Amino acid sequence: MSEFNNLKLDVENEIAVLTISRPAALNALNSETLDELNTALTEIEGRDDIKVVILTGGPDKKDNAFKSFVAGADIAEMVNFTAPEARAFGIRASVPFFKLMNMRQVTIAAVNGFALGGGCEIAMACDIRIASDNAIFGQPECGLGIIPGFGGTQRLARLVGMGRAKEMIFTCDNIDANEAYRIGLVNKV
């Protein structure tokens, strides 16, 4: 298996646990992390001994608390993108999302803490979503003047219905784990 800077991959008893670990950035997805995620998923997909993939966010290094599953795309990296660079980033980011959706292994998002923007979207790309009590979901992109990327508008509407999806997207309001369960965004709290 490959070595990663922003991911940790553990395989045991036919289960791969893939942990996104960028605690200083609340596990936000930058280009390097997306490339590593794509590499890891490609390697996992090719292994017959792995039946289940659990995607989760790593803890904060200071207090070991789980503050963020994935806080979205890394805005600090994106802020200086030109239009062609932003388009290329969106295309690059969509690859691991579609890979998650189409894997032969069962994919589970174990959501702990923030799942905002791209974090909510990567969770929705998984077959099953399980949220901890401290999970917070949201689509804050409209507050930045953009729409949810990475398939977020389509997946959210399929999971929670068009009305709820529009409300979450247009208002940029976050919801807690219990509300996410109530509306069908997660399978279990």
Protein language model features and the residues they cover:
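Hydrophobic alpha-helical membrane-association signature
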Residues: 33-36, 89-92, 122
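C-terminal alpha-helix plus adjacent terminal tail
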Residues: 1-13, 58-66, 172-178, 189
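Histidine-centered beta-alpha loop that forms part of the nucleotide-sugar donor binding/catalytic region
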Residues: 21, 73, 112
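Crotonase-fold acyl-CoA enzyme core
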Residues: 99-189
